[in-house]
Amino acid sequence: MSRRKQAKPRSLKDPNCKLEDTSEDGESPDCKKRQEEGDELEEEEAVHSCDSCLQVFESLSDITEHKISQCQLTDGADIEDDPTCSWPASSPSSKDQASPIHGEGFDFGEEEGIPGLPYPCQFCDKSFSRLSYLKHHEQSHSDKLPFKCTYCSRLFKHKRSRDRHIKLHTGDKKYHCSECDASFSRSDHLKIHLKTHTSNKPYKCAICRRGFLSSSSLHGHMQVHERNKDCSQSGSRMEEWKMKDTQKCSQCEEGFDFPEDLQKHIAECHPECSPNDDRGALQCMYCHELFMEETSLLNHMEQIHNSEKKNSCNICSENFHSVEELYSHMDSHQHPESCNPSNSPSLVTVGYTSVSSTTPDSNLSVDSSTMVEVAPPLAKGRGRKRAVQQTGDAPTSKQARVSYSCIYCSKQLFSSLAVLQIHLKTMHLDKPEQAHICQYCLEVLPSLFNLNEHLKQVHETQDPALIVSTMSAMVYQCNFCSEIFNDLNMLQDHIRSSHGFPNPVTKDSNAFFCPHCYMGFLTDTSLEEHIRQVHCELGNSRFGSPVLGTPKEPVVEVYSCSYCTNSPIFNSVLKLNKHIKENHKNIPLALNYIHNGKKSRALSPLSPITLEQSSLKMMQSLGGTPSRLAGEYICNQCGAKYTSLDGFQTHLKTHLDTVLPKLTCPQCNKEFPNQESLLKHVTIHFMITSTYYICESCDKQFTSVDDLQKHLLDMHTFGFFRCTLCQEVFDSKVSIQLHLAVKHSNEKKVYRCTSCNWDFRTETDLQLHVKHNHLENQGKMHKCIFCGESFGTEVELQCHITTHSKKYNCKFCSKAFHAIILLEKHLREKHCVFEDKTQNCGTNGASEQIQKEEVELQTLLTNNQESHNSHDGSEEDIDTSEPMYGCDICGAAYTMESLLQNHQLRDHNIRPGESAIVKKKAELIKGNYKCNVCSRTFFSEGGLREHMQTHLGPVKHYMCPICGERFPSLLTLTEHKVTHSKSLDTGNCRICKLPLQCEEDFLEHCQMHPDLRNSLTGFRCVVCMQTVTSTLELKIHGTFHMQKTGTASVVQSAGRVQNLQKLYKCASCLKEFRSKQDLVKLDINGLPYGLCASCVNLSKSASPNANVTLSTNRQVISQTDSLTCVEAKNYKTSVLKTRCSSCNVKFESETELQNHIQTIHRELTSENSATQLKTPQVSPMARISPQSDEKKTYQCIKCQMVFYNEWDIQVHVANHMIDEGLNHECKLCSQTFDSPAKLQCHLIEHSFEGMGGTFKCPVCFTVFVQANKLQQHIFSAHGQEDKIYDCAQCPQKFFFQTELQNHTMSQHSS
């Protein structure tokens, strides 16, 4: 079976693995390491590929079925012997069955398991004859193989091997073939599969000539031939060879299956280690045994294989005496036009040459052919005698022995053509068949046998020695002038340079020819090397050829075609005409010469001259006296005579102009003077220019810049991960995870409450939680909203609430604080006051103790009334006091602790009870730069420098977001922002249109319409709809708007002081009294309280139902004795009529309320109507007409259309989704979203990239830490008129520039 890697056979244990230094499992460390490497290689052998076609399969059942159906593996013994079929197929359905791969239930036979067999077990002393038996047995050692496959129950020693094996079951095939649709789970499987798409099969069978891609496939194929043989001699020899250690190369340790592969590897890769460099190896055609000499090969074939084969032809069953005669006879079957094949060719001692033609149109286009060397008689003769037919009277002693050389391994010499043929068919079977040319008559012959027959019959009477001697006496005359050359190369160079040969020599043309064998070469250097190596001539015979001294020396008559680029040579005009008819049919001028019967020598620039003319020319070239006159320049085409050489050459050029072919463009038939201009012109027809963007790293081409940028980001960029705790940088996600686990993962205990599942870091926090929530609440149902403390009665709770009053007021902004430290901090940060000003900001009241107690009691009672004054029975009580709970992380202030806890849980992921952890986090995030004046810390030096300016003087660093003017303090900026209000002349609420009479009504009304999106205060101005950042700003808005309505703030303050002096409230029922004597003074926990008589009596008679009685009593008293006017009661009644009973939403009219109930709560209305009247349901489509005065409050994000109610906007958005789908693409980064709101939030993030994670409103400059918070703020606080960026092509407007860019690219891009 084909393997990706050739693993070391496990039959040989490492002798270095000793038992002295053993580890835990009894193996030495080195031995254990080598065994693990071997196990990895063994797991890699799980590739299932066919030996014949190299097709890869995922399971062994598939490859078995493939071999039976497609590769004709029908013999049962073949399947059994095949190592790929020794492992059962695994599938996910077999995991519930008993595993067939365990060794307990497998019958190996009696001879298996005994010591001494080739494959020993690494866990016990047993050994086996086959590797498949060993694998089955190893599965029984479950204690040594801890990792198990969940699909087929196969055991593995390593986890990575098990995971790699599981991919074969799960079908995770991420490696795809580029040639076909095949996919594989491993890359090595894909590499093996890719070999099936290659047409090159270098490994060929010597018996049936079938090609294979790998040596292992050839080895498996050879086993089929061995089983078909009747004799087992070669099979036993192959088994003996497999048992030897000579399968490995001694130089590079590469393994081979056959000796011929090893010998071929040594000859090609390690020629210095070859046993004989001068003579190559000869291989027997029957048993593939190698021999260094011809005598040894012939003797081996006569002695070993003569009795078996008897040299009989497989086609006609004719027997021959020698192997040489058999090979010659077999060639005759392939070429029936040759001589009688039954005549055995006699070995004549003549040489032969072969000249190749590289003309594209020529039928004789071959690369090279057999070469011949004229050598002296060999010193070592053959071991047997051969019958040679001697014809003629020439004695054999005068005939020279000719040696033959192979064109593929030029160092080998052969004494006969038959031996050379044996060598070619055994050692160079993959080489193409060559055409052979006779050196005497230049006849082209298809095979060595035909050449041998031709030499024997045609040139048998010629003396080889004489022929060899005449080869050097050939001279050539130029057909266009009288120049004579003794070398063919010199003549061709002369024609190209002197007579303007039109077609330049191409790259593949043979420009230089050997004077001995006429073999062509591309360069002069390669020709000289060929002459030196093949013909054993040290000098340059190309330029040193002997010249004839007498005019009686022969002249070779050759003809060359001028239409071919390399001028092929022919020995007769008939062959030249035949060549022109076959290869140059499209040239009418050449056909005219043929049809007219001319022996056109104009077509042959290599035409010969007479012997006398050649002798005269040679004598002139040697410096002798000229023996011919000047008038002897005769044109061989027309017979014209010229007395000068210049005139003769000019005349010949006229013949060339009529004969030479014209260079025309095949596309437009335009004529050109030379080949270079023709090539440039034709290139224009086939040339097209295109622009590509090439990656500088991997040279990949892309058609657009975006594709190139995406490729660079995906393949050639590195993403780094920075730890925000220690600022260390890592190159991968795994590295930073490991860093966080090692450096910043401190183990801490978490205490969890089992009742509410809250986690606490310390046991003290948990105890405090249990105390306030699970221990005291059993009997105390009244809980303080500020500190969370519980009380048994409502009187105790009301008395406790008075302790949360603020005693220290700021004289600049009227803020109040619980402690003097908070007041001093407020003065430093907000008003830049660093002196001790608290003596002027004392407590409320005079210095006398009596007045102080009276004022304190009145203040406490007033605060209780304000904190418990409700607007509706369904609404919660809202505290109007200043923010007293601040976040230690971001500085946000809230009026109630519950709001602070919600803020910490939502924004900082801090649960209630983690106060200590919050302080630690606040300490961790403190900066390293500390102010020396106020001890405030900063993260950067620039922040500290900017803060120091506040101590040096009033710097105007507060900018108005509307007009851009700067102010020195936040107070002055707040007062300035009020002047930009759009509702200066009215004091009505813009939400419910209720008129506001005083500043208290304004503050109370703002609490009725809270702004939940405002994370700082939770409120907004209900008159001008501006977002307020603090309670001070809200008060300034109330003062400003109430002044415009004619109510002076001075009169209001005087009225409040007068009311405080006259009215006294009960701490329980909040009933007001004119005199202090109407209240009973009580001392609870060291503090004085005032209660009315009825409340004192109710508190004395407190019972389990006391709470209900008190609340009922208080409602009755508040309804009868309250100081609220009748107009307020009527207003509340009207409000209740226009308020939804299900969701408590108020509407301006009853029509709007009914429409709201029918659209939003239509299920409840349908149920009520069905139970009462059982009438058909009212259609939910009833809506207010656009002609009404209702405000447009619903706007589509996509197209910015405004609608009047929620039902219309829902229908409109649904239509958008039906038409456009759920994919909304960002044109800036090509990211898609399923809703326009998410796309808008994403575009907001684009606008603030690189801003440090902060998002600022473009209208009011409010800063947010999340993009969705800014989006909610824009929807609630700003309208269509506040949008900044207008589209130039349509009326749509946008808040951010990125929205405009995305809109332009998606809607208006051409």
UniProtKB/Swiss-Prot annotation:
Protein's GO biological process: cell differentiation; regulation of transcription by RNA polymerase II
Annotated transmembrane regions: none
Compositionally biased intervals (Basic and acidic residues): 11-21
Source taxon at top rank: Eukaryota
GO cellular component labels: nucleus
Keywords noted in UniProt: Activator, Developmental protein, Differentiation, DNA-binding, Metal-binding, Nucleus, Repeat, Repressor, Transcription, Transcription regulation, Zinc, Zinc-finger
Gene3D superfamilies: Classic Zinc Finger (3.30.160.60)
Region (Disordered): 1-46, 82-106
Record field: compositional bias (Polar residues): 87-97
Keyword Nucleus recorded: yes
Annotated localization: Nucleus
Zinc finger motifs (C2H2-type), residue ranges: 48-68, 119-141, 147-169, 175-197, 203-225, 247-270, 282-305, 311-333, 404-428, 436-459, 476-499, 512-535, 559-584, 633-655, 663-685, 693-716, 721-744, 751-774, 782-804, 808-831, 885-907, 929-951, 958-980, 1019-1041, 1064-1082, 1138-1161, 1194-1216, 1224-1246, 1255-1278, 1285-1308
Biased composition range(s): Basic residues: 1-10
InterPro entries associated with the record: Znf_C2H2_sf (IPR036236), Znf_C2H2_type (IPR013087)
Listed GO MF terms: DNA-binding transcription activator activity, RNA polymerase II-specific; RNA polymerase II cis-regulatory region sequence-specific DNA binding; zinc ion binding
Family under the similarity heading: Belongs to the krueppel C2H2-type zinc-finger protein family.
Function: Transcription factor that can both act as an activator or a repressor depending on the context. Involved in BMP signaling and in the regulation of the immature compartment of the hematopoietic system.
Protein name: Zinc finger protein 521
Organism from which the protein derives: Xenopus laevis (African clawed frog)
Lineage of the organism: Eukaryota, Metazoa, Chordata, Craniata, Vertebrata
